[in-house]
């Protein structure tokens, strides 16, 4: 009797708890064009998307730029990538930067040809853009799971009209962008996300949402998910404990599901610019450390009501191993051999 009970419990114990066990592989096509061929844990050349899905990844995040000068990350680029992702059996999460280049808290440049002087014109342009992106994916028989209206928009989006000096404009833009997604021809309406940086900082999250929702121009029903970036190497205050508090408060105050949409852990960090958070200081800078970090992070996300998932940011961008940080290497791929590290298997257990 006891033996049979244990057997019946095994599937529950081994099943993954997170809805989204994800990775952002936006630079895959660029890396392949540069001659990089990824190898699985057996040292065999294999498509990166197949390596990832075989190790438990079930969702891929892709950044989308509007009109980049060289075509990198534009709509056509993302269609090519998404077709491969969908064929591999993973869901697709589009991270709309709403710019021709990088958008983050330090820079939210409005795309070329979009209005920088009239908010009504800009909201209409944004609506038509999100509508067109989703419809183009639908025309290509590609389903979208999540759409983020902007990337790390704690300082606003589509500057100058969408700066935090005018939260009503921010609210109007988010409302308009969301409805472009809702009005699209996607077979199932994608989940709509708002994404902020510093997910561990509850005060930052609270101020943004409280202020933008107070305008009345953005409705709680306009979006489904709250996404956050969580990088442990930019502040000693970015503890797992602080993240847990922040995510818990976000969910309970706004009744939205929460997702950590960007995170990393280094395999090499000889000279970090900032001290690492105290509750992460024992984790080594190694592939084993990546596994330990993601397991601990998953425990935090799973412990939050409606905590849905984690996306590892650019684990295979071999030509940019530091990933913008002061750590030398945050990848899950060996930069000398292009073979994935053992840490990639952690997704099976998240």
UniProtKB/Swiss-Prot annotation:
SUPFAM superfamilies: (Trans)glycosidases (SSF51445). Its EC number is 3.2.1.89. It catalyses: The enzyme specifically hydrolyzes (1->4)-beta-D-galactosidic linkages in type I arabinogalactans. The active site is at residues 152, 262. Pfam families: Glyco_hydro_53 (PF07745). GO terms for molecular function: arabinogalactan endo-1,4-beta-galactosidase activity; glucosidase activity. One of its GO terms (cellular component) is extracellular region. One of its GO terms (biological process) is pectin catabolic process. Residues 1-16 form the signal peptide. Its main location: secreted. It is found in: Secreted. InterPro entries: Glyco_hydro_53, Glycoside_hydrolase_SF. Keywords: Carbohydrate metabolism, Cell wall biogenesis/degradation, Glycoprotein, Glycosidase, Hydrolase, Polysaccharide degradation, Secreted, Signal. Belongs to the glycosyl hydrolase 53 family. PANTHER family: ARABINOGALACTAN ENDO-BETA-1,4-GALACTANASE A. This is Probable arabinogalactan endo-beta-1,4-galactanase A. It comes from Aspergillus niger (strain ATCC MYA-4892 / CBS 513.88 / FGSC A1513). The gene is galA.
């Amino acid at each position: 009797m006891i033996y049979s009970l244990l057997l019946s419990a095994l599937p529950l114990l081994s099943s993954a708890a997170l809805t989204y066990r994800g990775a952002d592989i936006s630079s895959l096509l660029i890396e392949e064009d540069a001659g990089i061929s990824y190898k699985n844990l057996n040292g065999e050349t294999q498509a990166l998307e197949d390596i990832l899905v075989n190790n438990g990844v079930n969702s891929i995040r892709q950044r989308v730029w509007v009109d980049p000068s060289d075509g990198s990350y534009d709509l056509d680029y993302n269609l090519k990538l998404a077709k491969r992702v969908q064929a591999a059996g993973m869901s697709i999460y589009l991270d709309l930067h709403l710019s021709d280049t990088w958008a983050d808290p330090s820079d939210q440049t409005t795309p070329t040809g979009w209005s920088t002087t009239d908010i009504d014109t800009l909201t209409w342009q944004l609506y038509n853009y999100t509508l067109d992106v989703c419809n183009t994916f639908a025309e290509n028989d590609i389903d979208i799971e999540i759409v983020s209206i902007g990337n790390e928009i704690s300082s606003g989006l589509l500057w100058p009209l969408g700066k935090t000096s005018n939260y009503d404009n921010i609210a109007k833009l988010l409302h308009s962008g969301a409805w472009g997604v809702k009005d699209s021809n996607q077979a199932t309406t994608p989940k709509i996300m708002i994404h902020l940086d510093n997910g561990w900082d509850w005060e930052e999250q609270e101020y943004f949402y409280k202020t933008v929702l107070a305008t009345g121009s953005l409705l709680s029903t306009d979006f489904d998910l709250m996404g956050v970036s969580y990088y442990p190497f930019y502040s000693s205050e970015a503890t797992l404990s602080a993240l847990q508090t922040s995510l818990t408060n976000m969910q309970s105050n706004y009744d939205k599901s929460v997702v950590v949409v960007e995170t990393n852990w280094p395999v090499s960090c000889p000279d970090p610019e900032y001290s690492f958070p105290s509750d992460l200081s024992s984790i080594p800078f190694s592939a084993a450390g990546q596994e330990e970090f993601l397991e601990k992070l998953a425990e935090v996300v799973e412990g939050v009501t409606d905590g849905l998932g984690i996306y590892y940011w650019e684990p295979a961008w071999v030509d940019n191993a530091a990933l913008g940080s002061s750590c030398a290497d945050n990848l899950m791929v060996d930069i000398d051999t292009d073979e994935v590290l053992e840490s990639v298997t952690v997704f099976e257990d998240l």
